[in-house]
Amino acid sequence: MADEYCLTNFIDFSLSLSLPLKHNRIKYTCFDISDSYIIFGASSGSLYLFNRNGKFLHLIPNKHGAITNLSISANNKYVAFSTQRSLICVYVVNLSAQATPQVIVTHLDQSVQVSCIHWTQDEKQFYYGDSRGQVNLVLLSSFIGHSLLLNMTVHPLLYLDSPIVQIDDFESLLLVSNCTKCILCNTEYEEYKQIGNRPRDGAYGACFFISPHESVQPSRIYCARPGTRIWEVDFEGEVIQTHQFKTALATAPAKIQKTTNVDNNADELDSNDELLDYQPQQLQFSRVQRLSHDFLLAYTELGLYIFDVRNSSVVLWCNQFERILDCRVSGMEIFVFTQTGSLYSVQLQTLHGYSITLMHQSKLLQCANLLRQHVKYFADKARENYELKLLNQLKQLLIERQEYELLNDISVIFDAIAQCTGTALDTQSSGGSSAATERSGSMRAIGVSTTKGPPKGVYVLENAFCDNLKQQPKSGHFKDALLTVTGKFGKNIIKYKFNIFAEEQQQLVRELIPASERSLPFKDIKARYESGDVGEEEIVSRCKRPTPQAPHISPEEKTIYNLYLICKSAKFSRTHCVERYRAVFDEYAASELIALMGKLAQLMVEHGDGQEQAERNCYEMYFNYLNPELIWEVDDSTRDYIASGFVLLNAPQCMEIVRCDHCAFPLRFDNACQYHELGAVLLRYFWSRNEQLKCFDVVQAVPALLDVLAKFYLAEQNLDKVIPIVLNYGQPELLLDVGRQLNVSAWARCFEQFAELQRGRLICVNCECVSSVEQDQLTRHFFYTWNCFLNIALDHLTASDTLSLIFKWSSYIPNDAIDREFYSRCLIKG
């Protein structure tokens, strides 16, 4: 039968913790535990070190502000902590009274607060997440063979869209949970994915659940979800099932079994609890963590919750702690830190194990009351656990104390013990029983199962690492999202930066690369940790299984496949990822690279992209890689390819263009432009070769390059072209730049055309004819005002010249168009 559990060994550390505090104003703010220490951070900024029994050991002063988070490294050598002043600090644990505490500090952005810290198994690195949604890796450096730290470096890894809630890691896998989603990263393979596709809003934790027997129970990831639900996820990032504990928690809370004098009213209170009507609980778990090998611990401000996620059941929940702030786990021991600064610990123990402990401690009456509270459990357990015969000692005690009512209540347990011990004696004395035992043993040896099926409500999980059992995902519902990781550690150092703000996952195709050519990094990591003889034999047998003959793929096809994956990753992460394919592009000549881009575009079309979108994707990859100055060196066909791509990428920005009535040249337009520097170099090349027609072809398609054309005309002192371009372009920065080289007469012409422009009459740069446009078309992108225009003019003219031009064109200037500040500037300038 399934075991039942209770919380025992209650310890209150409050008295021990209060001794080192010399002032009532100093409060503990956070804590962490290890095998050797309990360490607290305080509002004073200091660290307080205790041993596991609560004895005070050491005080580490700190003047960098109140401590908000802290974490102890796996080997107990270092303590990483953060402060309210946006600092990350690392303390080298040294309990020597003569040694000066060594603390190294790094400053963060003042607007950012660290939300969680997590050490890896490597003593020289840890992660931290902040309120901005950024995850960083901190690497420590020290003298070889010494614990003396030299420096620590911070490397950004992830930029998410909300504060980080919890971080966990397993080997090269990194699990990050923020307020909207969970991200699973494989830092070794530079891949990561979002777990599930349903966003959430709130602080929900996630953790790894590593199995010691991989072949029996595969390792999993568990992610808290709204509504007291928990996702069970495999190491491929796929949600296997959802555990719903909302209704299962409509039960009485567990009482902490305190080894004190027996309360005569305890039984009455427990019976009253059973009569109460407990409602389903809608809970939010901001942190989940593994408890021992089998259970998952979660907590809220009002209670502890322990789940058996393997069997989808509630072990127990307890509401005897008030205002819980944080919890930590060590083996089966749970440490609870409250908002009042108190620390308590309890231990999770089976009921029958606790009863035997009470017997060994000679607390017989307390043990008898425990049996009365759980009569059915102990009666069933006594029939299969021979060790419980120790409880027979209670019978004599109850008779001696004349506790006949209590003896009668638990008599069924003694009957079960007698039945168990009698069966054991019969088994030892009966040859037939021996033969039966032998037969049953042989049946177990050949794999015949005599157990019943799983009880109702228990999930039977499939082995995610057995390919012949796992259902193959359909291509139409594949949710993997491979992204480029900006930083790596261990074998590779941090290389790239990236940004994730994906609100929904993009569809990728798993069959891009055949199975024989494709690595499955998330499964490979799990396979390395399969332990035991059964697991090893399974791996060997898989290796011997004949693999199907994979189709041959040429190196060029592999390159195209890789480029396709990089492109899709870049779209999802909103980064260029140019460093990932720069080395590939460097191996090709210009003409060969153009041909490769054509094949890549064709592959994108085959996998669902439109022809134009595929070409745009290829052009973006090429332009992100291309150095614009290389336009001077490439051949004409490559240059034409670049010009065509530049026009294609900027086509959407050119949809709303007001054109000349006479020659259709752009008059008003949106001056936003992609790869403006590339277009500027392209125009300079054409202009230097006297290929003005090609310049005008590009500018007519992408009028945002007219600012480059204005500078060409300005160098030739062709003001008839410069002034219309500057005024039609509608960018104050261009007027500021060009205005430095205009004299008074040129500014007079500029005033004249600006007045005409305010009347809706625009001069074409190409044919120099005047076109009339509607007022709404004029103001759609136009942001010059008389006040802005005159202030720019005053920067380059004297006050008297500016005022005389204003007087000349005063009939065209509205009364309220000029601010008082302008006239004040004129007076100051003289």
Swiss-Prot record:
Has a role in the biogenesis of eye pigment granules. Eye pigment granules are specialized forms of late endosomes or lysosomes. Biogenesis of pigment granules in the eye requires molecular components required for protein delivery to lysosomes. GO terms for cellular component: cytoplasm. It comes from Drosophila pseudoobscura pseudoobscura. This is BLOC-2 complex member HPS5 homolog. The keyword Chaperone does not apply. Pfam families: Beta-prop_HPS5 (PF23756), TPR_HPS5_insect (PF23757). GO terms for biological process: eye pigment biosynthetic process; protein targeting to lysosome; visual perception. GO terms for molecular function: pigment binding. Gene3D superfamilies: YVTN repeat-like/Quinoprotein amine dehydrogenase. Belongs to the HPS5 family. Keywords: Pigment, Repeat, Sensory transduction, Vision, WD repeat.
